[in-house]
Amino acid sequence: MTDPVCLKTGFAAAMTSMLGTDLPQKMAVAVSGGGDSMALLYLAADWARLRAIEMAVVTVDHQLRRESGEEAALVKQVSQDLGLPHTTLAWRDWNGQGNLPDAARRARLDLINGWRGPVQYVLMGHTQDDQAETFLMRLRRGSGVDGLSGIAPVHDVMASKIDDPSG
């Protein structure tokens, strides 16, 4: 079992590495309800509270699985228990054409960017499996050396920053 103090210390170090000492007033965490994003929610809520940073929570319900609404409701309840405002954004635009995972990812980023307002940073959690999957998908697509990587710790998306403290 991972030591919670070490986990919190490691998270704080990752955040400092990404943000430096100029901390934002407002941040958000994108939470799907999966283990990676729920862990991120708890860590980010604690980290932000200790630094007087206003934290909000956003969930994108892609409505592709029957249980997705229940997962969004669970995230809302946990967020409220932590004293954090929560918003669920629904994606209804899948037309059945093309690459579903890519369309869902793009929709998630677009919806979050449309929602975020003055929030400068949105944290997103990813597991090691997500990292490996991203690397393998890029390899399969024939990415060159520059394109062969996992998910970058910081993404600049539409003039906003989307951060992944799991690096």
Predicted features along the sequence, with ranges:
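Core alpha/beta nucleotide-donor-binding catalytic domains of modification enzymes
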Residues: 1-167
